[in-house]
Amino acid sequence: MRSKVKTIVSSGLAAGILDITAAILIYAVILHKTTAEKILQSIASGVFKKDAYTAGAEMTFIGLGFHFLIAFIFAWFYFKIFPYIPFFKINTVLSGVSYGFFIWVVMNLIVLPIVFPVLPEKKLDFALLLSILIVICCVGIPIAFITRKYYAKWY
């Protein structure tokens, strides 16, 4: 029998690992747009600003920590709202897709503009669709499936 904490931790870990792995593979390895280190430093720069890029390897690990903190927060939130959203109990894949899109909206239209007041304008292009797809597939869907497994014993 799974516990609430194990469910939230496992869904947060799965989402965090899948998301950062996809980001590094796609943006650093395949597209050569950046490096794994810069991806993680950019996460840390939300708090440490420009110092995140010059403070060395420790900022890479701090960025990774922030990344997982965010993943755990979204995993916890889905776990808490699951019993109150009837749709989540009906179709796990569509629930994950909708929650992944919700996460993308929260991060890109609320959190990032607050943390980084000057961001490039968003255009409906391949990069935008790719970023949405990564969050849906690597964060929303895994959180939905892991959380659903916990609640399956009640619904």
Model-based region annotation:
Residues 126-155:
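Terminal transmembrane helical module of multi-pass membrane proteins
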Residues 61-79:
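Hydrophobic alpha-helical transmembrane segments
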Residues 2-3, 83-90, 153-155:
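Membrane-interface helix-boundary motifs at transmembrane edges
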Residues 53, 109-130:
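Interfacial helix-loop-helix junctions of multi-pass membrane proteins
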Residues 84-105:
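Internal alpha-helical transmembrane segments of multi-pass membrane proteins
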Residues 30-56:
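Membrane-interface interhelical connector segments
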Residues 2-31:
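N-terminal signal-anchor transmembrane alpha helix
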Residues 14-23, 70, 74, 99, ...:
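Alpha-helical transmembrane segments of multipass membrane proteins
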